[in-house]
Each structure stands twice: as C-alpha cells, then as structure tokens.
C-alpha cells in the first residue's frame, strides 16, 4: 500500500523497449506473516498494472519471464502475485527445460517511456495504447489461461474458472469426486493465471456454451465481477455463481483462504437452478 504512489508514477511513465519492470507482490490471505490479511488484486487494477498469478513455485520463473516480455512489449509495469503458501513452499525445477514460451509480437513504438509528458497524456497513453496492447498479448498467451477440461458444445453444462493457486485444489477435487476426473462429464474447467486484464477471448467458448459458470477465487470477488460485466455487454443467457449462487445465497467466503474442503462442499451444495454436474 505504501508503494502505490511510486508504482502509479512508474506505470504511467512507461518502460523502455529493452528494459521492463516486473513487480512481485506477496499476498498473505490469512495474515500468517503479516499484521493483516489482504489481497493485492484491487491495487493492481487501480494502478492499471496487468499481472500474473502463478499457481505454484514451478510457474514463477516462466510467468516471470513472460511478465518481463509483456512489460517490454506493452510499456506497462507487470505484476506477479505470489501468495504466502507458494512463497513458503519449495520445488525442484529443471532449469534446462525452461524455454521462453510466450507470444512473439512486434511492439507499438508509441507505448514506451518518453520525456516530460504531461499528466493527462500519460494517463491517456496507458488506457488508450498500452492496455489495449496487453489485451492483444493475453489473447495469444499460453500462460494466461490453462485448460484442464475443455468445453464440449452440446454437452458442457457447468464451466468452472479457478483463479490462481486455488486451481490446484479444484483439479484435485474434480479428480476425487467425479468419474474420470470429469473428463467424460458435463464439466469444463479452466485455470486463469492472469486475473487482470481478463483474457476475454480465451474464455469465450466457456461463456457462450456453458449453462452456468462458477468462478472460484479467494478473498473478494474480482474475476467474477469482470465476467458479469462481459455477460451483460454480450447479452449472454447463462447463470453466474461465485461468492453467491444465482439466487444470492452464499457459496464461498470473501475472507481467509479457500481449501479443498471448500471446493468439495460446493459439490454437495449445487445451484438451486437446473444446472447438473
């Protein structure tokens, strides 16, 4: 929070084409190592900083490398949200197998830092030039969205979007609770590793085919709100659940940390509507 002003100036100022700035932010959803429990999603949005949310230790390096590439391409600072459980864990990573795996795109020369732009020009450049370039990148990024169970037209009834780390628990729950891990079921499951700006094009199949979409994210709703906005604009006739079900009944807490138990309880408490798993 205390760094917000400096980060806002850096992001609206822009970065150099051979520079790049990645901001690693440590989130402590339970206050394990902090005086307060908190989330950084709304801060990134307020600053206009796109960000990745690695699910585990192994994803930090590839997403970090892509974050630098995206920063150079778009002129934006790019965030890397790392929650305390990921920061406190360890993993063996084979560095020899790490290869850059991100879009190869020619940058717009107008996105990069210039000298002495007035405040209004810096703000408009961020929103009219840089962030649209980020959206173009997201549409082609393999790290931004990972599909575990694909959408099947005419069959998929429930689409699940897991945001960041919680996708690990969702995948475990599906393997445990559903036959064949849900592969032959009516469920589609996507892990979202870039909560903002939302890679809308990568989610279009799910949002147009599924009868109901369930967004599972920790803390206050953030991705769910973005998807609701898309559905209103596109006039999508589907049910949307997340912190509450379509009838307004509570499903997931807006505080603390989600667990495998939370996900399994969702399976035993289905939507009161006609969506079947």
Describe each PLM feature range.
Residues 2-6, 31-38, 63-66, 72, ...:
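Short acidic, glycine/serine/threonine-rich loops at helix termini
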Residues 22-26, 79-85, 161, 216-217:
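Short beta-strand segments
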Residues 81-116, 204-266:
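Terminal amphipathic helices with adjacent charged low-complexity linkers/tails
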